[in-house]
């Protein structure tokens, strides 16, 4: 607040604002009085009741004055000076309100305080006559849980009620009477209740008369309109009524709820249709009881009138008042033209009918006098009721229409009789009506006229046809009884030739949030005896009802007097309705029950209003911007008046003399007095604000006039010109409408601003200047585009005729004074007229700035804003000149080229017609014309031309050595040429022009000045690297392809998307114009109606590196590419399991063909081939296994088994010899039976289908050892591919990634550089993929970016560092080593899973792992040269920990008998922990299959022996008794071992050994075995209580017991895996002996027999 005061003081001097002047109502005293006893505090707001008033000061204090009977102390009842309401001190009140005898205030925290008379509960206090001091009112929303206090924004008070508007824009009411809008019969209402009928709508303002209420509500956006229910939500009556007549059916959809609930236009949206039904539908309710019994008496309803559907409809409309919806679509009639023609005949016939019926309807005079509205209002209640009585739904041809017409006439006669009982409106003269039939005819014509005007009501304010002209009163010459036919059909026929132009919706987001909405509705409720509700009748309403005729009138403020209402519009007009006894409505037209324009001043617009008891005040704009005050209403009785009971009033509003007072900012009206708040004009600040507000409101009126009188009629013409012309003009009109709406909103906000604190920093034009600057810029752009394309010269003859007829109007509106000016120039001046307003803004803001100190922030902001508007005005002026320059250029340009080059947004910058620029090396007679537009450089030659878009154009000056002084090099994606200028100055001019144009084209904007910044800051040179879109036309590979992405010096470079016309698309990175890096490529396959899809790496425009290619046929290849071909290691999946030939190949490719080692899985045949390939065929050594257990290894030729081979069947039958085809024996060989018998000789035939043998049968001697039997078994693997030859491509690829052409040949530093690059590149690519890296993965990648550095001698610590690095590297496929391991795991699983899970392949699988270890170890030693070779020893930096007990001696001794000299470096020790866990499942499965038979024997013995208790088993196994545990410690308790005890002895050792199955590597498994031995020693030591020495004879039975109790299912597989993969140096050490013991136990268990 301090800063606010300071700013105000600087601008104004001191305390010269908010002065209070009071007039007596009706006295017209020339000089108003200053409020008695009032000091000098600035008053922001005042409110007046019948005999009292309140003032709100700038510092948030409230003062009461007048008669205050509710005060407790006598001195305060009639205070001599305004009395401070001490109860409100410190609460900072922001708004006040008064009713007739009570007051209210709202604090800045949204709390309401009430005081004064409370007989009707209007102060929200129960059972209390008066509330002497302001007391807070509790308002809480019961719908929320817990109850939330409702914050209030505004307050309005009537005589017996109060309304509050909450911050969520809902109305809360309390007090007494129907004016509360609450559904209740219990009064008074002392607890504030929500007015539910308006819940969900945005209420902008509330106002209270004595006994009626008004609300200003924001219109619903179109999408918020909801579909219709079948019945009314409030009274449960049908929304569409149907009455079955003798020959037709009458349907009415104009339901109006008796509670005063009207339907929204869309809710009445039901098509009228022909219905023929023998059973008439009737409504339930015959009427509703009002709280006001007088209203019920006035209705005077007879029972006979409520029997027919038409009468029911009429009754409902009398009670509830609704209008036939005008937003409905026309029903689908069979033949609209027939109906239209028929209607014409019908209209001629009905004129005669009218004359014949003249005598029959003499009683309608009062009705017509009340109901005829002026042209501007939609139909009133009576007309609406009449119209909806008889809506015929005949099929609209022939007899049906005639029948409807006749029956309708009878219905209408009934209605007339019904209406004649309604009372005449009070105050309406009775002798001025014309004769009945003529009046009725006028009424029906008016109705049809209104229906057609409201025709297709758009919810957008920008519908050009929506706002009717406010002037003339033409009427259509259609007969009255045409209402028999559906009014929709009439509307449709009336607007057949009208162009529908719906322009930009006015919901502009930001502007609507910051400025008051003009899309408003007025809702009224309460008592309506004087017509103050505006519904065309005098009936009360229990609930809010929309005053439809104010829709689209842009009402921005409401005021309610004692029994009349005022609505102020954005166009500075006032609509008034209600009691006009004293002329308080400002006009003398009837009826006064509907809103009509007040005739305040023909020249001045009204910007503020106040309504008192019997009078109104209008604050108007004057020529010198000082507000003038008009008074309209009651006058006090003059001296000697003999008729005091007939008080007089004004016939027209009277201007009060108040110019000497100062600038009135607000007027307030009470009963007998009214007051004005006045500001003195110190330093011109107030005058400048009023000038801004007045000119803005006048500007809006001017724009509205242009829209309604020029644009709307122009756009509604049938033939405007070409499609382009219409589009351009519609764009102009749309932007114009948007600007117009913004100006209207701003004018309304300025009116509110003048009534407030008037702080400079809160001016919308300064605070949110971008709203205005953008709107003006958009509008100017659309007008300039229209002008460039020829402007008004494009318009067709009907448009030109219209403009010629209205030339005087055009001249007047465009402010062109010269009568000789051409029509086109006038139209251009009119379109550019709004731009002038920017200069006015700049001027007024500058004026305001001078009222402040130069150092103040206000001065700076106002100065900056003024500069913004001025610079934009100059800029838009420049844009207009550019448009005119471009237009004149097109007029001289050759016609054919104009059509192709002329575009609305294209502007000419410069051209070389004066030969200032020429093409280097051009022919002697060639003509080269260069034209620079804002979006392209055009090179024209004779009749041809070429367009170079600026976004993809690079210009640079040539150096003197290469091209002379005046050369300019122009580079485009497909052209490169040199331009020579005539002089160095010309060269500089062209270079600057081209560079500036390119820069603007790239930024996507013209050279608009930066808002709030300098407009001179220009980038001199456009960037060499940029984003742009281009379509190639020349390049053979890229012809007609479109590229959108990054460029560098004329070539695609960086990320981009390239699309070919045939549907091919590449999306990825480019380098020097070619695909290079990572990208995605799609190629449509029209034959299969699918597409090929490649995602992966590219090099120089070709697929190169890792990628995935998905073929349209369903095949998928994942692997390496080179020159668009599969080359290197890859996986090809063909088909799926459900398809005809599913298969999978993984292996090496050369030039798009399988070559080298690969594995082929033929899923259909159940065979897997593992061997060599050449030219897509199996060639060389290989192995085949089948799902039936057959195993073949040998030679292949052209996909067939050919040459030497070995074949094994599942039952161990072996053939070793020659083959000629798949599974076909042919030649010399040996067949060995499972029992060892064998046949040597010649074999021919297919295996499994009979083999022809010529040879010798051998039966081995019984004395031959078993070892000699399976000779072939020992030969297995000799004809398979050597392990080191497998997957060479995988390892070669890894070496290549490290920068080595062959294994081990390369620089280490270069390898590490490549690793860093790979990690960075892969991470960047991974960011674009949908998979998100976890935090741990990200940390792993970050740690891998550090290269391990090793200086000095190699140690165990360095060895551990390398081990840790390898574990991390192999964990991420983004690292070359990680990718290698991932690929090896994939190929290993692919080989040995499924059909490959064959026990014959175990040795191959083991060899393969050993080969992996050897080859990876070579890679690791290359990266870490200091790592010793295989089998070397690393000295220990610290001695072995002392105190470890040797299991052999059982003693604790620091001196080991065979101390390890150091740590042995082996490939398996380093790499198996990384590799084996990943390969373990398939490998262990092979071990299990291979040891299947002996495992079964072992397991059977284990299960059998484990049935015995511990003591029995120990005895059976021969364990010495001294080692038997006597007692056991279980959960801390010592328990004796009983004969029945089971699974208790050596339990810790058993548990330890069971963990062998959870480990992967042999070293880990050996550690488990070692730990088990130690646990056994500990257990024995605990029972013996003394040192002892193990001997193998003692140890073996105990360990055997532990192995049995451990119950390891696949112990044989575990033993064999350790044996195959353990480091050789461990075999003779301690762990080797322990392992041998375990192996002995395994074989011993198989031979144990239980006695």
Curated annotation (Swiss-Prot):
The modification Phosphoserine is found at residues 459-460, 477, 486, 1329. GO terms for biological process: axonogenesis; behavioral fear response; endosomal transport; in utero embryonic development; locomotory behavior; lysosomal transport; neuromuscular junction development; neuron projection morphogenesis. InterPro entries: Alsin_GEFs/MotNeuronReg, DBL_dom_sf, DH_dom, MORN, PH-like_dom_sf, RCC1/BLIP-II, Reg_chr_condens, VPS9. RCC1 repeats lie at residues 59-108, 109-167, 169-218, 519-570, 572-621. Residues 895-1001 form the PH domain. The modification N6-acetyllysine is found at residue 527. GO terms for cellular component: axon; centrosome; cytoplasm; cytosol; dendrite; dendritic spine; early endosome; glutamatergic synapse. Residues 444-476 are annotated as: Disordered. The modification Phosphothreonine is found at residue 504. It comes from the Eukaryota. The keyword Repeat applies. It holds the Pfam family MORN. Residues 684-879 form the DH domain. Keywords: Acetylation, Guanine-nucleotide releasing factor, Phosphoprotein, Repeat. PROSITE patterns: DH_2, RCC1_2, RCC1_3, VPS9. MORN repeats lie at residues 1043-1065, 1066-1088, 1094-1116, 1117-1139, 1145-1167, 1169-1191, 1192-1214, 1215-1238. One of its GO terms (molecular function) is small GTPase binding. Residues 450-461 have a biased composition (Polar residues). Residues 1507-1651 form the VPS9 domain. Forms a heteromeric complex with ALS2CL. Interacts with ALS2CL. May act as a GTPase regulator. Controls survival and growth of spinal motoneurons. PANTHER family: ALSIN, ALSIN HOMOLOG. This is Alsin. The lineage of its organism: Eukaryota, Metazoa, Chordata, Craniata, Vertebrata. The gene is Als2.
């Amino acid at each position: 607040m301090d800063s606010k005061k300071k700013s105000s003081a600087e601008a104004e001097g001191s305390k010269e604002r908010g002065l209070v002047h009071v007039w007596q109502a009706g006295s017209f005293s020339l000089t108003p009085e200053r409020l008695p006893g009032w000091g000098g505090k600035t008053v922001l707001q005042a409110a007046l009741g019948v005999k009292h008033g309140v003032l709100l000061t700038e510092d948030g204090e409230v003062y009461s004055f007048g008669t205050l009977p509710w005060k407790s102390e006598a001195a305060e009842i009639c205070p001599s000076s305004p009395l401070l309401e001490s109860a409100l001190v410190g609460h900072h009140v922001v708004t006040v309100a008064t009713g007739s005898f009570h007051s209210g205030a709202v604090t800045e925290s949204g709390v309401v305080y009430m005081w004064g008379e409370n007989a009707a509960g209007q102060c929200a206090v129960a059972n209390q006559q008066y509330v002497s001091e302001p007391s807070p009112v509790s308002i809480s929303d019961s719908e929320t849980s817990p109850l939330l206090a409702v914050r209030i924004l505004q307050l309005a008070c009537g005589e017996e009620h109060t309304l509050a508007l909450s911050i969520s824009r809902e109305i809360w009411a309390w007090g007494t009477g129907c004016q509360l809008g609450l559904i209740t019969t219990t009064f008074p209402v002392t607890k504030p209740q929500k007015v539910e009928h308006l819940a969900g709508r945005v209420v902008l303002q509330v106002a209270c008369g004595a006994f009626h209420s008004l609300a200003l509500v924001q219109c619903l956006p179109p999408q918020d309109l909801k579909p219709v229910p079948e019945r009314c939500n409030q009274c449960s009556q049908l929304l569409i009524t149907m009455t079955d007549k003798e020959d037709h059916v009458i349907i009415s959809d104009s339901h109006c709820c008796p509670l005063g609930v009207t339907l929204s236009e869309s809710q009445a949206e039901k098509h009228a249709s022909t219905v023929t039904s023998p059973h008439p539908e009737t409504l339930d309710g015959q009427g509703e009881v009002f709280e006001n019994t007088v209203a019920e008496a006035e209705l005077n309803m007879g029972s006979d009138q409520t029997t027919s559907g038409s009468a029911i409809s009429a009754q409902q409309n009398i009670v509830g008042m609704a209008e036939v919806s005008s937003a409905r679509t026309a029903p689908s009639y069979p033949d609209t033209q027939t109906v239209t023609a028929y209607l014409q005949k019908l209209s001629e016939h009905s004129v005669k009918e009218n004359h014949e019926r003249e005598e029959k309807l003499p009683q309608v005079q009062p009705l017509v006098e009340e109901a005829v509205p002026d042209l501007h209002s939609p139909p009133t209640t009576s007309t609406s009721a009449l119209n909806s009585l008889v809506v015929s739904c005949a099929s609209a041809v022939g007899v049906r229409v005639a029948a409807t017409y006749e029956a309708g006439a009878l219905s209408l006669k009934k209605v007339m009789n019904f209406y004649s009982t309604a009372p005449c409106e009070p105050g309406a003269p009775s002798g001025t009506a014309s004769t009945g039939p003529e009046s009725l005819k006028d009424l029906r014509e008016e109705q049809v006229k209104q229906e057609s005007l409201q025709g297709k009501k758009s919810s957008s304010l920008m519908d050009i046809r929506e706002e009717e002209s406010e002037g003339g009163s033409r009427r259509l010459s259609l007969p009255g009884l045409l209402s028999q036919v559906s009014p929709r059909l009439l509307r449709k026929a009336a607007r057949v030739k009208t162009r529908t132009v719906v322009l930009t919706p006015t919901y502009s987001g930001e502007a609507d949030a910051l400025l008051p909405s003009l899309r408003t509705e007025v809702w009224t409720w309460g008592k309506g005896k004087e017509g103050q509700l505006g519904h065309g009748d005098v009936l009360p309403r229990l609930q809010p009802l929309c005053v439809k005729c104010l829709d689209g009138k842009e009402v921005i403020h409401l005021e309610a007097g004692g029994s009349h209402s005022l609505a102020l519009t954005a166009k500075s007009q006032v609509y008034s309705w209600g009691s006009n006894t004293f002329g308080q409505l400002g006009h003398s037209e009837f009826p006064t029950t509907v809103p009509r324009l007040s005739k305040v001043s023909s020249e001045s617009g009204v910007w503020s209003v106040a309504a008192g008891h019997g009078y109104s005040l209008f604050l108007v704009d004057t020529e010198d911007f000082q507000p003038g005050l008009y008074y309209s209403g009651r006058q006090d009785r003059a001296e000697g008046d003999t008729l005091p009971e007939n008080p007089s009033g004004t016939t027209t509003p009277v201007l009060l003399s108040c110019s000497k007072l100062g600038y009135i900012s607000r007027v307030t009206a009470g009963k007998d007095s009214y007051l004005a708040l006045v500001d003195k004009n110190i330093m011109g600040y107030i005058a400048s604000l009023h000038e801004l507000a007045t000119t803005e409101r006048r500007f809006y009126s001017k724009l509205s006039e242009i829209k309604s009188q020029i644009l709307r009629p122009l756009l509604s013409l049938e033939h405007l010109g070409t499609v382009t012309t219409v589009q351009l003009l519609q764009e102009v009109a749309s932007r114009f409408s948007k600007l117009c709406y913004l100006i209207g909103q701003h004018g309304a906000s300025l009116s509110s601003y003048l009534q407030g604190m008037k702080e400079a920093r809160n001016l919308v034009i300064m605070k949110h200047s971008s709203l205005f600057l953008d709107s003006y810029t958009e509008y100017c752009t659309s007008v300039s585009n229209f002008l460039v394309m020829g402007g008004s010269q494009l318009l067709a003859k009907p448009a030109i005729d219209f403009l010629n007829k209205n030339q005087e109007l055009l001249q007047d509106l465009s402010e062109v004074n010269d009568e000789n000016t051409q029509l086109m120039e006038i139209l251009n001046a009119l379109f550019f007229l709004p731009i002038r307003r920017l200069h006015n803004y700049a001027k007024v803001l500058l004026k305001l700035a001078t009222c402040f100190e130069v150092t103040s922030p206000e001065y700076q902001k106002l100065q900056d804003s003024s500069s913004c508007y001025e610079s934009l005005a100059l800029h838009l002026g420049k844009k207009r000149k550019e448009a005119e320059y471009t237009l004149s250029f097109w007029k001289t340009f050759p016609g054919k080229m104009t059509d192709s080059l002329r575009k609305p947004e294209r502007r000419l910058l410069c051209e070389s017609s004066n030969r200032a620029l020429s093409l280097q090396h051009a022919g002697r007679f060639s003509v080269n014309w260069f034209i620079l537009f804002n979006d392209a450089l055009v090179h024209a030659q004779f009749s041809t031309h070429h367009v170079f878009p600026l976004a993809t154009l690079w210009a640079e000056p040539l150096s003197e050595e290469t091209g002379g002084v005046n050369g300019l090099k122009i580079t485009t994606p497909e052209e490169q040429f040199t331009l020579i200028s005539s002089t160095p100055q010309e060269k500089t001019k062209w270079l600057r022009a081209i560079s500036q144009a390119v820069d603007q084209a790239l930024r996507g904007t013209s050279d608009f000045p930066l808002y709030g910044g300098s407009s001179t800051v220009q980038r001199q040179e456009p960037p060499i690297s940029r984003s742009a879109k281009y379509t190639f036309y020349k390049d053979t590979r890229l012809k007609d392809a479109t590229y959108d992405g990054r460029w560098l010096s004329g070539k695609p470079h960086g990320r981009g998307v390239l699309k070919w016309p045939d549907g091919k698309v590449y999306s990825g990175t480019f380098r020097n114009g070619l695909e290079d890096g990572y990208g995605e490529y799609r190629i449509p396959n029209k034959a299969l109606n699918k597409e090929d899809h490649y995602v992966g790496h590219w090099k120089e425009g070709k697929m190169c590196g890792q990628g995935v290619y998905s073929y349209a046929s369903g095949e998928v290849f994942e692997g390496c590419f080179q020159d668009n071909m599969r080359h290197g290691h890859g996986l090809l999946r063909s088909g799926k399991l459900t398809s005809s030939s599913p298969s999978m190949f993984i292996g090496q490719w050369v030039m798009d063909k399988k070559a080298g080692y690969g594995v082929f899985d033929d899923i259909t045949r159940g065979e897997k081939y593992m061997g060599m390939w050449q030219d897509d065929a199996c060639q060389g050594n290989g192995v085949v296994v089948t799902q039936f257990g057959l195993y073949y290894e040998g030679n292949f030729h052209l996909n067939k088994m050919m040459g030497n081979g070995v074949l094994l069947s599942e039952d161990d039958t072996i053939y070793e010899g020659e083959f000629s085809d798949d599974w076909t024996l042919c030649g010399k060989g040996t067949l060995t039976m499972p029992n060892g018998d064998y046949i040597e000789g010649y074999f021919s035939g297919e295996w499994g289908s009979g083999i022809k043998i010529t040879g010798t049968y051998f039966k081995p001697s019984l004395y031959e050892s078993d070892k000699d039997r399976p000779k072939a078994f020992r030969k297995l693997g000799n004809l398979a591919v050597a392990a080191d030859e497998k997957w060479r491509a995988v390892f070669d690829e890894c070496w290549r990634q490290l920068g080595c052409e062959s294994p081990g040949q390369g620089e280490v530093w270069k390898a590490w550089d490549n690793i860093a690059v790979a990690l960075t590149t892969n991470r960047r690519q991974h960011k674009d993929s949908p998979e998100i890296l976890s935090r741990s993965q990200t940390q792993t990648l970050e740690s891998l970016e550090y290269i391990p550095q090793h200086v000095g001698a190699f140690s165990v610590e360095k060895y551990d560092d390398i081990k840790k690095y390898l574990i991390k590297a192999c964990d991420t496929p983004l690292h070359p080593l990680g990718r290698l391991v991932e690929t090896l795991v994939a190929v290993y699983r692919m080989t040995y899973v499924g059909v490959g899970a064959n026990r014959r392949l175990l040795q191959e699988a083991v060899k393969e792992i050993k080969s992996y270890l050897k080859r990876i170890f070579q890679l690791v030693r290359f990266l870490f040269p200091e790592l010793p070779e295989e089998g070397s020893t690393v000295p220990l930096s610290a001695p072995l920990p002392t105190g470890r007990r040797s299991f052999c001696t059982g003693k604790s001794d620091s001196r080991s008998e065979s101390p390890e000299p150091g740590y042995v470096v082996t490939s398996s020790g380093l790499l198996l922990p990384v590799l084996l866990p990943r390969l373990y499942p398939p490998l262990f499965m092979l071990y299990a299959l291979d040891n299947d038979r002996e495992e079964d024997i072992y397991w059977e013995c284990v299960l059998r022996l484990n049935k015995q208790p511990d003591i029995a088993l120990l005895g059976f196994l021969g364990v010495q008794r001294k080692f038997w545990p006597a007692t056991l410690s279980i959960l801390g308790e010592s328990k004796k071992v009983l004969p029945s005890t089971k699974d208790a002895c050596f339990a810790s050792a058993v548990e330890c050994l069971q963990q062998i199955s959870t480990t992967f590597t042999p070293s880990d498994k050996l550690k488990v075995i070692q730990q088990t031995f130690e646990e056994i020693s500990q257990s024995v030591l605990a029972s013996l209580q003394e040192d002892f020495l193990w001997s193998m004879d003692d140890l073996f039975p105990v360990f055997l017991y532990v192995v049995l109790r451990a119950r390891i299912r696949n112990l044989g597989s575990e033993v064999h895996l350790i044996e195959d993969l353990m480091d050789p140096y461990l075999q003779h050490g301690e762990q080797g002996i322990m392992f041998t013991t375990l192996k002995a136990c395994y074989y011993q268990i198989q031979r144990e027999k239980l006695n």
